[in-house]
Amino acid sequence: MSYLNTENIARSKGGVEYHPLKPFLPEGAKILFLGSFPPQRKRWCIDFFYPNWINDHWRIQGQVFFGDKNHFVCEGEKRFKLDEIVRHCEEKGIAFFDTSTAVRRLKDNASDKFLEVVEPTDIAALTNQLPQLKAIVTTGEKATQTICATLGIPEVPKVNSYVAISSPPKGGRGGWSGEGALLWRLPSSSRAYPLSFEKKVEAYRKMFDAVLR
């Protein structure tokens, strides 16, 4: 199965990039990771979320759930095991998308600081498909600020903290009520973020234990 949004890829022109991936929303998902926007495709090693080989998201999940940071790494290759990642996320109820549906890159890199949001994601349309959602998780400043504005949360949570979500996104009809849900802000899995791998694992483990127990 392909997770590429070929229609969006085809219409990405004139400096505007539309999201190249379809939302990954497994049935019964309790956690929704929302980043800012994927890196350029030249940096991908898999056609899925957190596709950059030097981003440690899948190594962190490997360490948290299997005690092995290389659990999702293809031995001898610089890519991740996509089928195992998808199966794992479906079993655990972990969904993925981003807070922007279209962006303009102001510099030729993957930094959130140089992303201009052209079209924010319709968060209500996502959460309405996830009635069992217990936590929205962000790992970057831009994504956190965007989701706080969408949810009407006045104070942006600090890294390694969470706030209660008092109401679902505006425009939501049915589906997710937002009741009892939390917005968690975790440290970025990018190696550019100045925190040890072990400390990141500890932070992610705390969130997963709290939400999935």
Please describe what each predicted stretch is.
Residues K42-L115:
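Short, surface-exposed acidic-centric catalytic microdomains
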Residues E91-T150:
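Internal catalytic-core helix/loop-beta-alpha segment
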Residues S36-F37, T138-A143, S188:
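Short, well-ordered beta-to-alpha junction loops that form the rim of enzyme active sites
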Residues N70-H71, L133-K134, E155:
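Short secondary-structure capping/junction motifs at helix and strand boundaries
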Residues L32-L34, I94-D98, L183-W184:
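Short hydrophobic-aromatic micro-motifs
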